[in-house]
Amino acid sequence: MEKLDKRREEETYLWIPVQFLDQALIAVLKCIGLLCQPAKKTAPSPVTFNQPEEQEEDYGVALKDDDVVVLLRDNKAKSKKRDKEKPSSGRPGQTNSVPNAAIQVYKED
């Protein structure tokens, strides 16, 4: 019994690196699109008589004589345009001083 338990532990210990590589390979193949696992089939849910029928929503697709026509709707929110911020005329870290010419203009008024 102890030998069997020890053997299972060794098998599990030896499987860990292979399991990591297996999972990494599966993930890479899924990203590339080469691995397509078959879809699991599930049983349909039971239908009750009191349950309302599902209504299909129109997502902008219309069918005409075996052709698909895409209808576009303009429901996009438009953002307000802002004016660009004007950079300050001073150097970073210093306060802006008023030039002497501007002071003389104000004194004349």
Swiss-Prot record:
Belongs to the brassicaceae elicitor peptide family. GO terms for biological process: defense response to other organism; innate immune response. Elicitor of plant defense. Residues 1-73 form a propeptide. It comes from Arabidopsis thaliana (Mouse-ear cress). It holds the Pfam family Pep1_7. This is Elicitor peptide 2. The keyword tRNA processing does not apply. Residues 74-109 are annotated as: Disordered.
